[in-house]
A protein has these predicted regions:
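Juxtamembrane intracellular "pre-TM" segments in multi-pass secondary transporters
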Residues: 2-14, 195-225
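Pair of pore-lining "gating" transmembrane helices in MFS-fold secondary transporters
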Residues: 12-40, 44, 219-238, 320
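Short amphipathic helix-loop junctions that connect adjacent transmembrane helices
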Residues: 37-54, 242-259
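Central cavity-lining transmembrane alpha-helices of secondary-active solute carriers
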Residues: 58-75, 266-278
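Conserved MFS/SLC helix-loop-helix module at the cytosolic interface between two early adjacent transmembrane helices
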Residues: 69-106, 283-289
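Structural signature of the two symmetry-related core transmembrane helices
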Residues: 86-101, 180, 290-305, 385
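Paired small-residue
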Residues: 98, 109-117, 302, 313-321
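Cytoplasmic helix-loop-helix junction between adjacent transmembrane helices
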Residues: 114-152, 335-336
Length: 404
């Protein structure tokens, strides 16, 4: 794509963008149809106490991201040599199998193992984002990055509602079977409809990552974006594994725990979907770094009232507001990476970013599960707010040092 043609989109661009957007939507949909209820699914497979159930739930979340953290650099290297479309197909195809098979689980251990296997081959959204980063004029990077995030979050908005309704009506296995089928359709759509302007590069002709980092004008900023991605993802995953259990503790006598938990899990996605386009345009106007700093500060403040919520509907309200702010966090970090890294290194840089995101997910899910198991659920929100505050301070001091 000619980067100077900021307002002109070449033939075929729309089809690729919409196909990848839909693929990211289905990926987010499938994840949120199943994972918010994984602890309730596990509870039906054995007799576990609170600490065991919280720990197994946290491990089920964490195993996928442990695998991602280990394998992502390999896939990123392959993406820069073979193209991102192939990586999207690999992710969608294998995920369709692993998610479907998870629905056949007879024990919590089996679920944990399948989640690890899924993590080794996942990464559809990150590779789709990297593909679009290489096909988008820089003047529109903020909007496109926010739209790619909107796809996943829109899916995460609808997913818990569908998953909660299906789980209540037919049991916790059915959402896994449906998600597996949808991911197979995503594989077919990516294979047949996505066009990538990419020339295969041999291993010998590929520029070493060390040399690319040496040539970057601001390596420190890239590293800070990796750390920011890790902390932001940690703040999300510290809450997600325990949402359904927390809702159950707030409404112990309700007969619709799965449905209400689905609504609570969906509210951040609604907030993000409603605000992503506006925040994306804001990033293109005032700069992604400024949006990221303010987003971290406001997110920190929002975790204060979440520490003292009286009921599930209050939790849903504050998570909705957090979702609005979240539209300016990870997309801003991805936009900063896009604008400061050469296109030939997108695959590897985005894969390293995915590794940090995976590490954050592991730390967050284990932190949330451990704290909630040893203390109370409210302490999870307090700890999460503190980590976001630390991230904000890192960004603030970094900006001041670069402007000094």
């Amino acid at each position: 794509m000619n980067k100077s043609q900021a307002g002109i989109l070449p033939n075929g661009w729309h089809k690729t963008f919409y196909t990848l957007w839909l693929g990211c939507f289905i990926t987010g949909l499938g994840y949120s149809m199943t994972m918010p209820f994984i602890s309730l699914f596990m509870a039906e497979l054995g007799h576990y106490n609170k600490l065991q159930l919280n720990l197994y739930s946290g491990l089920a979340f964490a195993m996928t991201f442990i695998a991602q953290a280990i394998i992502s650099p390999y896939w990123g290297n392959l993406a820069d040599r073979k193209g991102r479309k192939l990586m999207c197909m690999r992710a969608a195809g294998v995920m369709s199998l692993t998610i479907f098979i998870t629905g056949l689980a007879q024990s919590a251990l089996f679920i944990i193992c399948m989640r690890f296997l899924q993590g080794l081959f996942s990464g559809y959204i990150n590779n789709a984002t990297a593909l679009m980063a290489g096909e988008t004029p820089h003047q529109r990077s903020g909007w496109v990055m926010s739209q790619m995030m909107t796809a996943g979050t829109a899916g995460s908005l609808v997913g818990p509602l569908i998953g909660g309704a299906l789980s209540s009506a037919f049991g916790y296995r059915i959402p896994f079977f449906i998600t597996g089928g949808l991911m197979f359709l995503t594989f077919l759509g990516t294979w047949l409809l996505v066009k990538e302007d990419f020339t295969t590069v041999s291993r010998e002709n590929m520029k070493p990552m060390g040399q690319i980092l040496q040539d970057l004008p601001n390596v420190k900023l890239i590293i800070i974006m990796f750390v920011t991605t890790m902390i932001v993802q940690s703040s999300t995953m510290s809450i997600d594994p325990i949402v359904s259990l927390y809702v159950k503790s707030l409404m112990p006598h309700s007969n619709n725990i799965a449905l209400i938990a689905g609504i609570v899990a969906a509210t951040p996605g609604l907030g993000t979907m409603l605000s992503a386009s506006h925040i994306g345009h804001l990033m293109d106007r005032v700069g992604a770094e400024k949006v990221l700093r303010w987003g971290l500060l406001i997110a920190t403040i929002l975790f204060i009232p979440m520490t003292f919520i009286p009921n599930a509907w209050s939790l849903a309200f504050w998570r909705f507001l957090l979702g609005i702010i979240s539209a300016g966090l990870l997309p801003a970090a991805q936009t900063i990476l896009t604008l400061n890294v050469p296109p030939e290194a997108f695959g590897r840089v985005f894969s390293y970013n995915q590794s940090f995101q995976a590490v954050g997910a592991v730390l967050g899910s284990l932190l949330g599960s451990t704290i909630s198991g040893m203390f109370t659920y409210e302490w999870v929100f307090a700890a999460t707010g503190i980590t976001l505050l630390i991230n904000y301070l890192i960004m603030q001091f970094s900006s001041q040092s670069r402007n000094a």
